[in-house]
Amino acid sequence: MNMLRKFILVFSALAAAVSFTATTAYAADHGGDHGMKVPKIGSMVVMSGLENPWDMAFTADGSMFYTEKCKGLSVKTASGKVNALYGMKGSKGYKSAGNDLFCEGQAGMLGVVLDPNFKKNRKLYLYSTSTKYHASGCKTNFEKCDGNIVMSFKVNKDLTKVSDRTDIVKDIQYKPFESNQPFGGPGAHNGGRMAFGPEGYLWVGTGDRHRGVCPQDNSLVCGVVLRIDADGKGHPKNKIKADQRFYTYGHRNVQGIDFRPSDGQAFTAEHGPWHNDEITALVNGGNGGWDPHEKRAGRGACPDQYCGYEPNQMEGMTPAVRAAYTPMSDTRFDDLMFPAWQNNGYSQGTGSAAFLTGKNWGIYEGRLATGIMGIGFGGTPGGMRIDIVDIAPDGESVKSVIHMPVGVSKRFRGLEMGPGNALYASTDEGEIYKISAQ
């Protein structure tokens, strides 16, 4: 049954990939689903000249908090004024700073979210890399390294400073040294995306930090999705008893988390090996199926005990052959969460994700927008874009995938719904775009 399900999944992903253009043309000509309108999409730059803007969060009045990976947290107020609030070690111009915070590779100051009761409690949450809890660890890539944290702050009324830092998660794993893999520098596969779910709990996505044991070892906070309260304690109904904070495990590098408006179902967007990025409906206690450890599933030894890019990690090869060697969703696991979508063979680098909300989005309302950073490898096109994914009600397949015509091709790192039902997108090139539909 699992093998049949896997075949259908891969076939569906391939079919979606080759039908992008046809789907777009049909929607434009025929008015899309059930006669609903196809919206006119427009984009404009609202900020530029930033350094790796990673994430955004909005207040009710339209003020935008944003992170820059190697600098810190700032806010652009509704009036347009920019206040630099909280920097990392070495950053200049910030009202305050955390000298334990740093950036390296894919790590740094990443996710930012506002408490659902922000108007009353003024609380904000940040995900960042930190040296504060290294203790005696972090001496090699093969030991525990508590190098990522989640912090809470209070923001003052006029958005000019933050205070009352409290570290609510202190043990998310970090990769401290270079290893023998593509993109193998320190800070690799660092996760960092956060979101509040409809029940008011904080969800935190992490990465496998290029350590083979991580995704399937529930004694380590890596390759997991947390569901925690404002103090960092696990939801009482989380099913993974090894660590009450864990909602799911077996992930590679979670980059997007959002919740389907119609039913509150949680979905992740995740980096896969080469051309196997995935979008997955999460199941409490479920396994993402990623197991890059050497000497498992018929594999031999791998560089630095990590088989995530094998069997030919430095050169292009047929994606299906690579996927068979170390599959992103391994059907060996009985608790596997089958992905709804795989980026099978069409560039790679799925970043953040956000469900489109508001009637202005027409036929796209309720569909998932995903940023594709478009790493071309082994002859594949770069394909930097935003895709609109129409996920089936059961969350186990997609009905269609089309490109959002935003008019620019960038490395879309972060996506967030903002004021006026507009989609905001941050890019590695240093801009934040407002994408509107009408």
Give residue ranges: language-model regions.
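Beta-strand-rich domains and repeat architectures in extracellular enzymes and scaffolds
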Residues: 45-71, 347-355
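Asp-box/WD-like beta-propeller blade repeats and closely related beta-sheet repeat scaffolds
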Residues: 138-195
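Beta-propeller domain segments
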Residues: 29-36, 93-103, 107-109, 117-119, ...
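Beta-propeller domains
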Residues: 65-89, 383
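Conserved beta-propeller blade signature
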Residues: 63-67, 123-127, 201-205, 265-269, ...
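Blade-level signature of beta-propeller repeat domains, shared across WD40, Kelch, NHL, RCC1
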Residues: 414-438
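Surface loop/turn motifs at the tips and blade-to-blade linkers of beta-strand repeat domains
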Residues: 45-51, 87, 102-104, 169-171, ...
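Bacterial N-terminal signal peptides
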Residues: 10-19
